[in-house]
Amino acid sequence: MKIFGLSDLHGDGRVHNATNGPNGPNGPSGFGFELTFRLLKDSSESSPPLWPARIMQSLAKYVFKTGNTLYAGDHVSWHCGLDGSESRLQHMLMGEDPQMQITVTPHGTVRFVQIIGACLDELQAVQQWNGPGVLQIMKRYPVTGGLWLITNMRRGESIIDIDPSVRNEIAEGIKMEGSNLCGISAHCSWLEIIDKDSKTLHHVSLEHSTKDNQINNITIGFDRNFNYKSCNTGELAQVKFLDRVHLAFNLEAGLLLPLVLKGRIRHGRHFTFKSLSGDSTITFVAPSVSGSLVNDEKPYAAQDSWLQVLVSNSFLESMETSLNFLNNPILEPLPKTVCWPEHNLTLTINPDKI
């Protein structure tokens, strides 16, 4: 199954810009990709089900709303059976379609990104390591999709259930390479603290988390194709250095913070949270990241709605220790606020559902 419309079908500007960047027709067509889905036929079905089309439509709406494109290696946490059942496949991984090659059209190039149903174990492996590596492991076993990565909604085993040695393989990959996940779209917000009263931000963050019913409870993660420098700010937008800031995340986004520190910052990389409502972006930056706006003397820099936060080597260990509760979040009442007065930083974790 595949959909059309994320790429430019007309070339006359009615849906997408008639040209895409300086390369014109040599650049991407529309958003530059289309979605595909391979589903194993259930013996009880006499015709193809409609739910894959609904999921693809929801993802397309997300792309049109945010302008964020999807690539092989990305993932989507969905939090319920993709077909509405009690299936363990409650999340999606994005891979290169093994059959549909990059196509050059009169209106630009088109990639084909395949949706693959995934268990929680597989989603977490992608977040902690990388999407292509996990997909290569899934291809080994017919039950997890085989070479064509066919989604079987009746699958009850993850790759780790099928082959426990995979856990060590993934752990070694994380140790050697860190995480390729460099950004997610989630519920987040930030505010400059002027009078040391952060209640305003707390209310704003809760408001943001209830705005979008279509994609209210999903998180979309991007691998290294996501460029933190491409956040939606004007080239001439003024940079403002801030003294104190307050960050807020929903629980699912917050659960990734230990990964951000261990798998990204400790490896000298950056990580970006983009608000699903489109009005906030937060990038955590390691000291070795080049081209950032922040430095040791000015660790917080804002450019329009985009905030950069420098996590210095001296701050990293303290931050990891303070956020250790996220490893057992069920034991903590939410919202929970953590403060680092010596670094002028406050962070709040809000519940996923308000």
What are these regions (language model features)?
Residues 58-59, 136-139, 331:
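Short, surface-exposed linear patches
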Residues 45, 49, 130-131, 312:
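Short, structured coil/loop segments at alpha-helix boundaries
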Residues 37-70:
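Compact, glycine/acidic-enriched structural inserts
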Residues 1-39, 70-247:
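Aromatic/basic-lined ligand-recognition segments
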Residues 18-45, 318-324, 340-342, 350-354:
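Short acidic, glycine/tyrosine-flanked loop/strand segments centered on an H-E-D-like triad
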Residues 184-354:
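Long C-terminal appendages of very large multidomain proteins
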Residues 55, 77, 130-133, 291, ...:
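Generic alpha-helical propensity signal that fires on short helical segments
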